Amino acid sequence: MTDEPSRKRRILLRSGKSPFDVASLEQSLHRDVFATNAGNLIFSDAAHKILTTPRAEVFSNGIRTDPSAAERINEEYDAFVVPLANAFRPTFERPLKRMTQLIKKLRIPVVVLGVGAQASLTYDASRLKPMEPTVREFVTEVLNRSASIGVRGEFTEQYLKDMGFRDVEVIGCPSMFLNGDTFRVEKKTEALTADSLISVNGSHSAVRVHGLDSIIRQAHERYPHLRFIGQNLLEAQLLHWRETSNPIGAQTSMPTHPSHPMYREGKVRLFVDPVTWIDELRAYDFSFGSRIHGNIAALLAGVPSTVLCSDSRTLELCRYFGIPHRKITDTPKDIDPADLYAAADFGELVNGHKERFLRFTGFMERNGLENTFTHGDGGAAFDAQLGKLSFPPAVRPWIDSDPESLSGRFSWMQSRMEELNAQNTMLRSQLDRRSGPVSIKVQAGDGAAAWPSAYRRARRVVGRPVRKLLRPEQ
């Protein structure tokens, strides 16, 4: 695009959805708006706010990469900004390749706003060696379109420098700069008690491999007001539908599994929007666990937090920002959250925040990006717009059968069935036009003929208890 003095700069942001996109719980889960992990929205929403200035508009591109959209992006946008988490990991190699293919076709600046490599707590990068050509190609294409690449911490910086790259800057994660150059965290009480409201979080791997299940179980016994905050799509599906097609969801030691005591007691939550997530946590006294953005959400709410680091991605971020943390491998399995709370010191986090903020915004300026705190209203308009919207509540365990809890689920399923029937009608019409009459029974309409296709498609998005209700009579 060509710049015009009176035209706002149009920035395309890689994010699951716009912060102002309000969807029902069912729609959010069906669309997977947080790209399997709600923590992604914490840093993408922060990036959206930071990039919004009087001279720039921000647009969400979605998470799925489409290289064929390159020409449209070149024509419609002035820059492509890509906040990433642990993108340098084997399981993300294919999406990283697709992103590289897109970037190769772009003629506009491409700025990576924080990316991390994932390895062990010992910073051993040997597991990343097989994907080194993919990482090298990605970073090369990014640096061909920007002054430098922003990384999350010391490990990723060294990883790229060992590959020969020099234009690498440690900037942390945009999420920590949601509120600008100040950061406030306050211990509301001298010590935790049985009456304290505590949040715990953790991944399936931390529970399965590192014994986090034992820590959670004992904390649950000690603290009646303990709540587990989930983040993954499969956890949301288990909470809302009591079932997921993902085999990892069968792990019964996770509080998001229907057989877990915390699930049965209704002590599990999952938020699909950062604004409700952070607002909910303001009432808590403490947060701990292995999820970095689960604990960053609490810190942004002003709540003391401690991260139990299980890999390099969480460890390097905690070290950079001065977030209280422990290696989960060195943490006793009977640790009391009260001990973590007492040991947590936020001096480094708070006192060094402004310097880190200036480093972050300096990186942005060197890459041609303005920020709302220096060049705008500090996010006031952004926050005001969010405040006018009504976001859905947290996803909670489905442990009751009252009409109110069922109405939203069945209303959504009815609308999905109508959509599927309409699609079937359209497909039948297209088939008729192209090849004449067909004998397959996929059309919409009354009676059993309409059921097989619609039922098979609807069953993929709901749990077994609901599928039984939807199953046509034989």
PLM region spans:
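Active-site anion-handling motifs in enzyme catalytic cores
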Residues: 1-470
